[in-house]
Amino acid sequence: MTVINGIILSTRQYKDNDLLVRILTETGGLRTFLARGAKKPKSALGSALQPHAVLSFEGAFPKNNQGLGYINDIQTIKIYQRLIDDIEVNAYAALIASLIDQTFEEGEQLTRWYNQFVLGLQKLDEGLDPQIIANIFEIQLLVPLGVAPNWRQDPISGQSVGQFDYSEKYNGIISDKHYDLDDHRLMLDQKTVFYLRQFSIIDLRQINQINISETTKRGLQRVIDHIYDNQIGLKPKAKTFIEQMHAWQNTLINFRQNGEGKSE
C-alpha cells in the first residue's frame, strides 16, 4: 500500500455499493480510483469522499498506468465548508476541477497544478471572489491547452506599455497603433486588459483580497469565454450551470425591481 495525496475532482456511483473517484494526485497526476463499499449506509469512505476535498489515503495507483487505482483507507481529509454551503462557490470550484481534468492527459505529472488548485480552494474558502479565482485558472490553463495568448507585448512592435486591445487574429494584445489591422478586435476597456495581463502571471499566494468592479468582471468573462468558445471549443457543464445561475439571479433582481416600481 502507498500513501497518496490528492484533490477529489468528482465522484460517481459504480455498481451498487462502490464509488469511482476522480482525483488530481500530488505525484501521479489525474487518476481514477475505486472505493469499494463507499455507497453502503455505514461506510466511512462514503461520507468523506466529497468533491473538492483534499485528502491523504492508503491505496494504490493503477497497475502499469492502466485501469483503476484503489482507495482502502483515508488518513486525513480537509473539507472546505464554504464550498458546501455556497452553491456559487461550489460551482466555480467544479469549473476549475473540470478544466484541469479536461486539459491534461491521464498520469501526466501535475504537481504544480495540484499545489495551485489547493491554493485556489483555500482562497475560495476564505471568501475571495469565486469568479476571479476561476478566471485566473482559466487564463493560466490556456498555455497547456495550446492557445497561449501573448499578454506581454504587441507582437508587431514589441510595445509593452500603453493602450492595448485583444486580437484573436494576432492571438494576444495589440497596441492602439495597430487597431486598424484587426476590425474584429474585442474593443476592451483598459482595466480589463490590465487584469488579463496580471492574471496570466499572478501567483495565488499574492492574493489576499479582491476588489474588481462588476463592469470589469463582465469584461474579463467576455474575453475568456470568447477564447474558450472560438479558439478551444471547451465548455464544461459547470460553466453552463454558472451561466444559468446568473441568468436566474438577474431575472429575480429585475422582477423585484419591477415589483417595487409598481408598488410605488
Swiss-Prot record:
Entry annotated with the keyword DNA repair: yes
Alphabetical list of InterPro entries matching this protein: ARFGAP/RecO, DNA_rep/recomb_RecO_N, NA-bd_OB-fold, RecO, RecO_C
Keyword annotations: DNA damage, DNA recombination, DNA repair
Biological process terms in GO annotation: DNA recombination; double-strand break repair
Stored Pfam families: RecO_C, RecO_N
GO cellular component: bacterial nucleoid
Name listed for the protein in its UniProt record: DNA repair protein RecO
Disulfide bonds: none
Domain of life: Bacteria
HAMAP family: RecO
Statement: the UniProt record of this protein carries the keyword DNA repair: yes
Function per UniProt: Involved in DNA repair and RecF pathway recombination.
Organism, scientific name: Leuconostoc citreum (strain KM20)
Family label: Belongs to the RecO family.
